[in-house]
Amino acid sequence: MTEEACRTRSQKRALERDPTEDDVESKKIKMERGLLASDLNTDGDMRVTPEPGAGPTQGLLRATEATAMAMGRGEGLVGDGPVDMRTSHSDMKSERRPPSPDVIVLSDNEQPSSPRVNGLTTVALKETSTEALMKSSPEERERMIKQLKEELRLEEAKLVLLKKLRQSQIQKEATAQKPTGSVGSTVTTPPPLVRGTQNIPAGKPSLQTSSARMPGSVIPPPLVRGGQQASSKLGPQASSQVVMPPLVRGAQQIHSIRQHSSTGPPPLLLAPRASVPSVQIQGQRIIQQGLIRVANVPNTSLLVNIPQPTPASLKGTTATSAQANSTPTSVASVVTSAESPASRQAAAKLALRKQLEKTLLEIPPPKPPAPEMNFLPSAANNEFIYLVGLEEVVQNLLETQGRMSAATVLSREPYMCAQCKTDFTCRWREEKSGAIMCENCMTTNQKKALKVEHTSRLKAAFVKALQQEQEIEQRLLQQGTAPAQAKAEPTAAPHPVLKQVIKPRRKLAFRSGEARDWSNGAVLQASSQLSRGSATTPRGVLHTFSPSPKLQNSASATALVSRTGRHSERTVSAGKGSATSNWKKTPLSTGGTLAFVSPSLAVHKSSSAVDRQREYLLDMIPPRSIPQSATWK
């Protein structure tokens, strides 16, 4: 076509359709979004495409004057017909180039190439499907793979940016919430709780008012936490009242507690949070396992929770405790000499249990293997960038020079995990047997092997301790059967008593009978001096054979005290003569009941070794949150 035909055609179009400003703006938006192809089908416009070397403005000026006048108004170029906008973003740069004398005119029926989206054409995006990839030739396949790699890199970059944005938003929210939380945490704590390393001074008004109450009142205990020092000193006017002790938690020291009343029970012991040394409070050795009160003070009236005592009952209990203190030492020596088998058995089992716990602590827990990745891939890491560049160079060399080798590598079958049958993992592992496994299966197998090894070591330690404990029981039973038969011949009355003491109690029976034992012991102590002596002397015996500062079988110790309390009740009904002979028998019976794994072998010989081992393993689990008395049978 000539320049005159172009000129006449453009003048015709300018006369037929004078575009408004809105049309111009909408056309601009459509062209920028790549939606111009649909308009071209309906309009049938002539498309004028400048040569790549020539700017669109100067080429059209040379082509036609009417187009130049329309461009002076800012309407003609867009209004006449759409122009290929592939160079529309670089108009300023293209104006500096020398103008081209040629104008390339395309026909109306020709479809324009689709605009670029992110550097890629939409047509190419449609072609990269799985079927097209399988049907295409190797060259096209490589081109598609490169294209997909570029897309993947772009998506990964977007993902990293989104993660960074989310992380920064979360950090801003956390910093905004911190001051509000600090304002809310300044609530005043209730006055009975004492926190931190604080001292309770002697002149506090709360303590003064509590010490000035009636003589028969009971002072509730303050709750002490942390490494505190409760240095409260009670006045002399509190000499006739029962002072409840403070709750002791953790490794605390309670200094200078002056309890002028002789009937105050020892401090309550909450379960310790760690291994805690025993607290010494004026000669009281306290066994710190669970909520159990045990102390070797003989005047604690069998550690009964006293409900609001009257002054008369207080005087009676102080008198009885004074009389119990004045018992002759010969009786205590006789009882301790008779208790030697039980004391030896308890001491041996204590040592065995401590040794087992020591060996269990020495066995390390299973640890997962350390990750083998030496560095994290990051664009900020120079070594990683070097590796990326090296990989690109090697890949290009393989593609350009080693065509055949690359084809053989591509045709190889992918790996598949022998365990989970997956074909994708970050790293393939080959076992010694030749099986190929994925990273996930390999790590789970390693963890399972470590767990099995750990449990086998624990079982070996338990079985060894069980054998030693059985040997100790058999030796003590062989030693104790002969003197038991010799002493059981003169009297026939105490045999049912012995059977009832030897009979094992389960957990619920022990708990339900415990309160009755304590109350019966208190009534007997106030009524008869003989029962006082029999009830208080085993407490001394208990602490002669358990001098350990970290005594851990406190439940068996309380069981011994409760059984002696029941035994004393029967001795009062039987008479003085049978009571003295029964007290000679009790060392053997209580020795039989102190079995810390299972009940006495004399009663449960029919139980199989498997049941004994199961009970033993259940009992030897170190108690974390439950009280110690709940795990003992």
From Swiss-Prot:
Q: Where is this cross-link: Glycyl lysine isopeptide (Lys-Gly) (interchain with G-Cter in SUMO2)?
A: K93, K178, K204, K233, K464, K487, K550, K585, K605
Q: Which InterPro entries match?
A: P66, P66_CC, Znf_GATA
**Chain residue ranges for the region called Disordered:** 1-59, 73-119, 172-238, 561-585
Q: Where is this region: Interaction with ZMYND8?
A: 181-295
Keyword Nucleus part of the UniProt annotation = yes
Keywords assigned by UniProt?
Answer: Chromosome, Coiled coil, Isopeptide bond, Metal-binding, Methylation, Nucleus, Phosphoprotein, Repressor, Transcription, Transcription regulation, Ubl conjugation, Zinc, Zinc-finger
Region of interest (CR1), residue spans:
144-178
User: What are the residue ranges of zinc fingers typed GATA-type?
Assistant: 411-464
* Annotated protein name in UniProt: Transcriptional repressor p66-alpha
